[in-house]
Swiss-Prot record:
Localisation per UniProt entry: Cytoplasm
Domain of life assignment: Bacteria
One Pfam family in the UniProt entry: tRNA-synt_1b
Motif ('HIGH' region): 39-48
NCBIfam families the record matches: tyrS (TIGR00234)
Family membership: Belongs to the class-I aminoacyl-tRNA synthetase family. TyrS type 1 subfamily.
Motif ('KMSKS' region) on chain: 229-233
Protein's recorded name: Tyrosine--tRNA ligase
S4 RNA-binding domain boundaries: 352-419
GO molecular function, one term: tyrosine-tRNA ligase activity
CDD domains per the UniProt record, alphabetical: S4, TyrRS_core
Function: Catalyzes the attachment of tyrosine to tRNA(Tyr) in a two-step reaction: tyrosine is first activated by ATP to form Tyr-AMP and then transferred to the acceptor end of tRNA(Tyr).
Length: 419
């Protein structure tokens, strides 16, 4: 199976400019292609992973990737299917975010070895050297306002208002493709389906300005089986940066994917062969309660993003927390596993009697409730049940002299911080 047909089989081809021509190009030799990443945050997230992994699949098939960091376009903001205009960031912020994105991309693409090693480019390099007058004369003249207004991404903003800054974004992205086509013989652009209008602006500019060959392929914006936009946990983005979304949190995210989505996501987010995925599907449908598809997803993606050590750590945290074995984990692991639970910073003057502390730290609302919970065996300190109403937190309860973990009932965790 050629690479284009495999991408289709995996559900990774949403739209192309000319499917037959693109398939033929990918079959006949090495194609140089690019994907753009605007630094709109200090990390990429799961939503970016579809295009990143598609880029990696093409590289493994012998094609040459160019990763474009939008140092210039990141200063403008893409209006595509956004309800309101993005906040403009400072140059310093965009440069900082761009550097972090470079580091993350190197985890997925091969930049060091091989004839088709990836190349990193920044569109600030060419936009900073072109004057506004030259841009209007040499680029703007190829775009009619009617053409620009016809883009769905613009149409949706006309009623609420769109600034000229954002309106011009599609020309800038189109010029990126032209620059890469002219200087690096890049003939394919890959991006999310919401980018179609901006991407075809590039093929139009290449056709009109140089009569060059160019293709566009979009990957789908992933939604779950309920139609909900994929890549968020509790309304928050799942980031590729371990400091923003820990490996444990990412592991839990994949572990909790719905049955109806699990096999489809294996095709999109892992490098398991289609035959391996089909075998998993059969086993999964025979025993869905064992959650083989979700466990495989969690293993493959966390290992891919954070490495095998982080994956094993996430599994261990999951198992120990499920068993209530707090002392089986390091403070570092506990902070991963309990990120997001209520925290209380203990002051030196605080009364460390269990009843007073439960109220002060917000575990319970009243001393009466605290006494009731302790008497009934509902309170655990570092995994040990406490039923002594006079119990006082001691140095022995401070894990690594830093935290104490309180559990109320089976699942409600609270962390006391002593630093």
């Amino acid at each position: 199976m050629n690479i284009f047909d495999e991408l289709k089989e995996r559900g990774l081809v949403f739209q192309t400019t000319d499917e037959d021509a693109l398939r033929k190009a990918l079959e006949e030799g090495s194609v140089s292609y690019y994907t753009g990443y605007d630094p709109t945050a200090d990390s990429l997230h799961l939503g970016h992973l579809v295009a990143i992994l598609t880029s990696r699949r093409l590289q493994l098939a012998g094609h040459k990737p160019y990763a474009l960091v939008g140092g210039a376009t990141g200063l403008i903001g893409d209006p595509s299917f956004k309800d309101v205009e993005r906040s403009l960031q400072t140059k310093k912020t965009v440069v900082s975010w761009g550097n972090k994105i470079r580091g993350q991309l190197s985890n997925f693409l091969e930049f060091e070895t091989g004839d088709n090693k990836a190349v990193l480019v920044n569109n600030y390099d060419w936009f900073s050297n072109i004057s506004f007058i030259d841009f209007l004369r040499d680029v703007g003249k190829y775009f009619t306002v009617n053409y620009m207004m016809s883009k769905e991404s613009v149409k949706k903003r006309i009623e609420t208002g769109i600034s000229y800054t954002e309106f011009a974004y599609q020309i800038m992205q189109g010029y990126d493709f032209y620059e890469l086509n002219k200087n690096y013989n890049v003939t394919l652009q890959i991006g999310g389906s919401d980018q179609w209008g901006n991407m075809t602006a590039g093929t139009e500019l290449i056709r009109r300005k140089s009569n060059g060959v160019s293709h566009v392929m979009t990957v789908p914006l992933i939604t779950d089986s309920t139609g909900k936009k994929f890549g968020k946990s509790e309304g928050n983005a799942v980031w590729l940066d371990a400091d923003k979304t820990s490996p444990y949190e990412m592991y839990q995210f994949w572990l909790n994917v719905m049955d109806a989505d699990a096999v489809r996501f294996l095709k999109i987010f892992t490098f398991l062969s289609l035959k391996e995925i089909e075998d998993i599907r059969i086993q999964f449908e025979e025993a869905p309660h064992q959650r083989l598809a979700q466990k495989t997803l969690a293993r493959e993606v966390v290992t891919l993003v954070h490495g095998e050590k982080a994956y094993k750590e996430a599994v261990n945290i999951t198992e120990q927390l499920f068993a209530g074995n707090i002392k089986g984990l390091s403070v570092k692991e506990l902070k991963q596993g309990l990120r997001g639970v209520p925290n209380y910073h203990v002051q030196t003057e605080d009364n460390l009697n269990i009843i007073d502390l439960l109220v002060t730290s917000g575990v319970v609302n009243s001393k009466r409730q605290a006494r009731e919970d302790v008497s009934n065996g509902a309170i655990y300190i570092n995994g040990d049940r406490i039923q002594d109403l006079e119990y006082t937190i001691s140095e022995n309860d401070k894990l690594e002299n830093e935290i104490t973990v309180i559990r109320r009932g089976k699942k409600k965790y609270f962390v006391l911080n002593f630093k």
